[in-house]
UniProtKB/Swiss-Prot annotation:
Subunit structure: Polymerization of globular actin (G-actin) leads to a structural filament (F-actin) in the form of a two-stranded helix. Each actin can bind to 4 others.
Keyword entries, A-Z: Acetylation, ATP-binding, Cytoplasm, Cytoskeleton, Hydrolase, Methylation, Muscle protein, Nucleotide-binding, Oxidation
Protein name (record): Actin, alpha skeletal muscle
Main subcellular localisation: cytoplasm
E.C. designation(s): 3.6.4.-
Entry comment on modification after translation: Oxidation of Met-46 and Met-49 by MICALs (MICAL1, MICAL2 or MICAL3) to form methionine sulfoxide promotes actin filament depolymerization. MICAL1 and MICAL2 produce the (R)-S-oxide form. The (R)-S-oxide form is reverted by MSRB1 and MSRB2, which promotes actin repolymerization.
Main enzyme class: hydrolase
Methionine (R)-sulfoxide: modified positions: M46, M49
Homology family: Belongs to the actin family.
Miscellaneous section: In vertebrates 3 main groups of actin isoforms, alpha, beta and gamma have been identified. The alpha actins are found in muscle tissues and are a major constituent of the contractile apparatus. The beta and gamma actins coexist in most cell types as components of the cytoskeleton and as mediators of internal cell motility.
Keyword Kinase: no
Organism for this UniProt entry: Cyprinus carpio (Common carp)
Amino acid sequence: MCDDDETTALVCDNGSGLVKAGFAGDDAPRAVFPSIVGRPRHQGVMVGMGQKDSYVGDEAQSKRGILTLKYPIEHGIITNWDDMEKIWHHTFYNELRVAPEEHPTLLTEAPLNPKANREKMTQIMFETFNVPAMYVAIQAVLSLYASGRTTGIVLDAGDGVTHNVPVYEGYALPHAIMRLDLAGRDLTDYLMKILTERGYSFVTTAEREIVRDIKEKLCYVALDFENEMATAASSSSLEKSYELPDGQVITIGNERFRCPETLFQPSFIGMESAGIHETAYNSIMKCDIDIRKDLYANNVLSGGTTMYPGIADRMQKEITALAPSTMKIKIIAPPERKYSVWIGGSILASLSTFQQMWITKQEYDEAGPSIVHRKCF
């Protein structure tokens, strides 16, 4: 693509928790903001203050005390299209300050999403925002590209959904994809619950954001859960304190590793699913026996929920225990992995070979929204 921002493609990774958006060819997203739309709880409290009927992203976050916050993307699937349009509008006009009708736009989606979801995305892009061209890419595949590989298995854990996606020579293997509706938001809810057991009360949507911050700053994955529980019970070495916005200081101990342990033991929150180490193993076992070696040696972590300290070592330990004893197992945890989907999109959209892959406005007008299934896979 050209260096000027005039025809550069836009890359927008719509996560359940954060929107990452920017220009193809950049090495990091220009805009990262929460996928939140907030509406005033009480109409007319701020009469004459020029109060808006809705706020998006950081502005919604900063006014969360007077708003009800909603996430239009749940478990990686867009559930509220009106709010989603507001988020896209905010992305183009306020964050990136571009006219969408001048830029091809690459969007991302979770694997195994309903077909109607990507059709509606396509329709809104062409009909509401009038983009000249667009493409929908699978998030985990982009993460793998960002790590410089075309073969491997990606554990992509975000705020709304977690996936194990085996990719061979650049193509996701759909029959072996494992999807787990357990991710960052569930961990935040679980942390709210176990902090309440300690006597701290967090209930509102605004307080949930405080707990999310506690989770991001203080939680970690234990290498051996039982040992860590014993250590926490016998000494205060694992305790950390956190100052709430009102100045009150709370102490958290074993909650620090009990919260992310849920990824390995979903029964903690009453889910009957296998943990992320087992789903990764099951996913590999569904692949052809000849490529398993390549997958074991290329376990790539991606997404914000893989940012816990200790998660790579624990994955290594758990998968080694499941795999054949002679198998070489490698977990790759790139430091920029919370943005690796976006980075992969930036790489893909700026490749010269990709330029013929875009769905153009003309193709859309001829074939309608279903074109997306033929051109994006």
